[in-house]
Amino acid sequence: MEKSIWLLACLAWVLPTGSFVRTKIDTTENLLNTEVHSSPAQRWSMQVPPEVSAEAGDAAVLPCTFTHPHRHYDGPLTAIWRAGEPYAGPQVFRCAAARGSELCQTALSLHGRFRLLGNPRRNDLSLRVERLALADDRRYFCRVEFAGDVHDRYESRHGVRLHVTAAPRIVNISVLPSPAHAFRALCTAEGEPPPALAWSGPALGNSLAAVRSPREGHGHLVTAELPALTHDGRYTCTAANSLGRSEASVYLFRFHGASGASTVALLLGALGFKALLLLGVLAARAARRRPEHLDTPDTPPRSQAQESNYENLSQMNPRSPPATMCSP
């Protein structure tokens, strides 16, 4: 009986102890899980939207914010924006802030159209682009550099795509010669979305007839060709997209000559007329010079000139009275 009581007492002591140990282990595991899933220290990161759209001629804002592991950094920093590709693309904007300053002095602004809107001290590198053009349609990458006690830098890898839209504009329209004395017309336009081109003219009727060239467009440029112009007159190229339309015209007037024999006779007649005209001019000049020679007085002979000289000499020296002779 005493042995049974002793065994029951041992079991009563062991069970609470085991329960306490298990509870302590579970608590420790919960504490470890809380540390793992808690927010880690700040790391480098860049937040940019995938795309920004704006119309040509307007302005666009490229947002860019970042985080970094260096808390309360107030040393010198540089903000940079690149175009085309990260790390190696050409810089379009750069500014630098001195230690403790929130003013980022602009060192580079391509064509004066890029301006920093954000404050790098507050982890904001947002950029404003003025007077957009179709050439600005590309990808841009923001970058920040620390150069104080901490030397560190970070740049966005994917960047933000700037999508520029534009109404169509015809940049060239011309008529070019083709083999076999034929002519063809070319029309080149730009726009985004790429415009659809159509030709209208005497040979195409009154309605617009779309004649798209098999040549592919280059970038935002699209070219349409009218391969054979069979009639003289006005040919109009029309470019249109969702933002508008544009038109330009070119005129074709061909010289319609006669047959071969008539053409030769016409050329010979023109040459003969020019020859007669030249002979008439030469004859008129010769007739004008002839009266001038007849009206010119003859030159007096030399003998008369000498006699008059002697006469003048005798008049200037009259004869003196004869000298008186004295006899011895």
Curated annotation (Swiss-Prot):
Query: Where, by tissue, is this protein expressed?
Result: Expressed in macrophage and/or dendritic cells of spleen and lymph nodes.
What residue range is the signal peptide?
Answer: 1-19
Got any disulfides in this one, which pairs? C64-C142, C95-C104, C187-C237
Q: Residues that bind N-acetylneuraminate, according to the entry?
A: R143
Q: What is the effect of changing K274A?
A: Abrogates interaction with HCST and TYROBP
The record, for Gene3D superfamilies, names: Immunoglobulins
Topological relation to the membrane, as annotated: Single-pass type I membrane protein
Give ranges for the Extracellular compartment: 20-263
Topological domains, Cytoplasmic? 285-328
Sites carrying sugar chains: N172
Q: Indicate the segments forming the Ig-like C2-type domain, all copies.
A: 168-251
- The yes or no answer to whether the keyword Transmembrane is present is yes
Q: Which controlled-vocabulary keywords does the entry list?
A: Disulfide bond, Glycoprotein, Immunoglobulin domain, Membrane, Signal, Transmembrane, Transmembrane helix
Where found, per UniProt? Membrane
Q: Which GO cellular component terms are attached?
A: plasma membrane; protein-containing complex
Q: How does it assemble?
A: Interacts with TYROBP and HCST.
Q: Which family does it belong to?
A: Belongs to the immunoglobulin superfamily. SIGLEC (sialic acid binding Ig-like lectin) family.
Q: What is this protein called?
A: Sialic acid-binding Ig-like lectin 15
Taxonomy-wise, where does this protein's organism fall, top ranks first? Eukaryota, Metazoa, Chordata, Craniata, Vertebrata
What gene is behind this protein? SIGLEC15
